[in-house]
């Protein structure tokens, strides 16, 4: 495994962003709270500022492991998909960092109207609070996917394709899983190739998401009540896994729970396999097409899990 960088080197890399510049970016992004919903207003960030967010956060991702080992208390959020106003609502509810520790499970971009604000806000917090704020990679943090589902077009419309490529380089360095005591977190799910967590630890970055195999499954697989063992996935990528597969995996690896995102669920969270898997989805009224709530899972010091719900808005 790569050695941890020497403290002075680490200092050098994380010092690459002036605290005053970072705080000003965060201030502008938070001020968006005061704008009228649906006003179409955007936060103004310069291309240089965004490039810096990508470069500095990328260094931090690479200094931290690909399988994060985190401690409770922590709040876990699922897909955001460019729904920036809802991301701000989540923080209003759970506390803006560093009042609470956070782990996000991926899918920051695509589909929603404000992928740029969403990802820039999250990267800014990652830089400001690197030991309290964590971001995993979702299947949409991948060039071949976000080229199609909106992020590329947003970057091109508001800036240029070059900036989209810089985000791609940053996304290729994101961690893919996190362990919080006996809770394993990832965007999608488990993999038929995953026997031991050391397999994840040994993956090197930067990394393109392959079309199949362990990393692909961690970001793409889904639980299914209709299958025993492993089944085909309607997405045309990866697999579905049954409750029996989950029980066997958890027992073998001495774990209690798999926490994942990746699927819209009506109440914002949903258990599967006798509460051995939980899906957390944090974009309410997803795409304006669903009536789902969004949720955030809080894990306290004693590893008790509770849920905070963002109700879908009444307006049609």
UniProtKB/Swiss-Prot annotation:
SUPFAM superfamilies, per the entry = Metallo-dependent phosphatases
Binding, Mn(2+) 1:
79, 81, 107
What the record notes about the co-factor is:
Binds 2 manganese ions per subunit.
Catalytic activity of the protein: O-phospho-L-seryl-[protein] + H2O = L-seryl-[protein] + phosphate; O-phospho-L-threonyl-[protein] + H2O = L-threonyl-[protein] + phosphate
Print the keywords alphabetically: Hydrolase, Manganese, Metal-binding, Protein phosphatase
Any Pfam family from its record, for instance, is STPPase_N
GO annotation, cellular component aspect: cytoplasm; nucleus
* Chain residues that bind Mn(2+) 2: 107, 139, 187, 262
The residues annotated as the active site are: 140 (proton donor)
Q: What CDD domains does UniProt report for this protein, alphabetically?
A: MPP_PP1_PPKL (cd07414)
Q: Where are the transmembrane segments?
A: none
Q: E.C. number, please?
A: 3.1.3.16
The entry assigns this protein to a family as follows: Belongs to the PPP phosphatase family. PP-1 subfamily.
Q: What is this protein called?
A: Serine/threonine-protein phosphatase PP1
Originating species: Brassica oleracea (Wild cabbage)
- Gene name tied to this protein: PP1
């Amino acid at each position: 495994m790569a050695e941890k960088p020497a403290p002075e080197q680490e200092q050098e890399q994380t010092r690459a962003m002036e605290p005053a510049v970072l705080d000003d970016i965060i201030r502008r992004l938070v001020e968006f709270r005061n704008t009228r919903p649906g006003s179409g207003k955007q936060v103004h960030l310069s291309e240089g500022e965004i490039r810096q967010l990508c470069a500095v956060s990328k260094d931090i991702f690479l200094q931290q492991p690909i399988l994060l080992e985190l401690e409770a208390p922590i709040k876990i959020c699922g897909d955001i998909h460019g729904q920036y106003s809802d991301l701000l609502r989540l923080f209003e509810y759970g506390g803006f960092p560093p009042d609470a520790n956070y782990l996000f499970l991926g899918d920051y971009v695509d589909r929603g109207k404000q992928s740029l604000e969403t990802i820039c806000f999250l990267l800014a917090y990652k830089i400001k609070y690197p030991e309290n704020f964590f971001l995993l990679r979702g299947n949409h943090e991948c060039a071949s996917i976000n080229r199609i589902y909106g992020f590329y077009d947003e970057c091109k419309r508001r800036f240029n394709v070059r900036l989209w490529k810089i985000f791609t380089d940053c996304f290729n360095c994101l961690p893919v899983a996190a362990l919080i005591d006996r809770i394993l977190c990832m965007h999608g799910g488990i993999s038929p190739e995953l026997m031991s967590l050391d397999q994840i630890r040994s993956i090197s970055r930067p990394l393109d998401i392959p079309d199949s195999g362990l990393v692909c499954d961690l970001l793409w697989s889904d639980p299914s009540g209709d299958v025993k063992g492993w089944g085909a996935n309607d997405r045309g990528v990866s697999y579905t896994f049954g409750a029996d597969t989950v029980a066997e995996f958890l027992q073998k690896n001495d774990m209690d729970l798999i926490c994942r995102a990746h699927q819209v669920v009506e109440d914002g969270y949903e258990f599967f396999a006798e509460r051995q898997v939980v899906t957390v989805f944090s974009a309410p009224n997803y795409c304006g097409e669903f009536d789902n709530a969004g949720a955030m899972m809080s894990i306290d010091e004693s590893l008790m899990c509770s849920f905070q719900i963002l109700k879908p808005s009444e307006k049609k």
